[in-house]
Amino acid sequence: VAIAINKDVDILFVIDNSGSMAEEQALLSKNFAAFISVLEDPEVLANYRIGITTTDSGNPRCPSAQYTPEGGNLVLSSCLDRVDQGEFTFNSDDFSKTCTDFCTKRNADLTVRGTATGVDPNEVPRKWIERIEKVSNINGVADNTEAFQCYGPQGVAGCGFESHLESMYLALAGAASPKSKNNYGFLRDAAILSIVVITDEVDCSYNPATKEIFTTNKVFWNDPAVDTAPTSSLCWFAGVECTGGPGTYSECHSQNWDKDRKVTTDPAAAVLQPVSKYIDFVKSIEEKKQEIDENQRVLISLITGVPVGYDTFDKEIPYEDRPADDEEQINFGIGPGCILGDVNAPTATARPPVREREFAEAFLDDPKTERNLYSICQDSYAAALESIATKIRDQIVPACMPSCVRDKDRSTPVLDPNCRLIETNIKGEEKDIPQCTEVNGAWTAGNGANVCFATLIDKTGKETLSKIDNISDYCNMEGFNLEFVLVRSAPAAAGTTISANCELSDNRTLDCPNL
């Protein structure tokens, strides 16, 4: 029987590093403990990786000769070192406090411990944060919250024509490409994948074949007759269509426009990359994961320009124009989706998402009953981050044996199972997994093995002397009488699957009365 024994979680953060994102990045650092604490809860103990990239994948208006856009590359560098490089300066304003309020460690103070991946058995430093079997790969910090507070802030010197979706695409594509030095091996075949985007503007993932819309073709510019350069309003006009209005719109949706501002059904002619490109790509990743665990879902979350309360259905996204001569209308093509502070003198505003909203909603079972967008216009992201992490936690389902297992010795109150766990590699070669032993209250592999399995058999928590062999509430409620735990000291090779071969009960009424 195929078994999904999985506490592995791969989390990609796509962080807007444009000039308006200083306070938002600071809040992310300030509240990140709310995220990590869920994953590291003793009842969860996720084996997680956290990769970080930015929304900057380059643009004709942001000359690559002057800087190097991340382009989806995972980055792992202390923000203190990047303060010195000017990455926290925008329009001559110093936003270094975004980093220095929470980070005290430079790269020289931080050591990235070498780790193996499913595609590379060599233990070398990777461009991500990870914690596997309660051991972090970052030395020099108290915990991974502190690590993220140094590695997470991405500065404010990035391109203002943000490409959230393309950056995400490049990051995930790179994870499967040996050509990507930073990203290759980041994704694990069976791991839960969570993608988190933090941004205050709309997606502007452009088609390189029509890049002239940023330079010589002014059809999407705010005022083609007057403007000498486009504003971010181009991203709205080139990727969105609304009904109703002008003024207040009843709804807005993504639209594929060609270079003449006509609707096109040809993806290659669309001036912004069609949203379907990104949905189909991530769906293909999800489908491969579902070959291992049919219940696994890719999780998408955005902290973006929606009102506080949108995630709980208490508010809806406003799509409203500002007056034509209003600075926000000129700069963005649409009014704010959310406002922080006084409406007449807001501390911050953010644009209402459309393309990225549609992408995120494509990974919900029913957008009418659940939402995965949280407001960026608030003083704390703790609740949003906790909610995002909780959705990850809820995907980490205990590995119940999905059949009733025979008790070899019914003279004792606990199950005495006869089981083998088998690891099968991508070539179809099988290997028996040894059983763990309990050492000082922890499951441990012996004889140099890098993987072992344990059987959890105590239904009440009082049937054995061990404190770590209790069956989870989940498996108990499902009526199963056996649960597995897999302990690894090194990652499984890509394509590895796990199956269980147990002697099954010939008396389910006795062995599994609740099944």
Regions from the PLM with identified roles:
Residues 1-515:
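Divalent cation-coordinating acidic motifs and surrounding scaffolds
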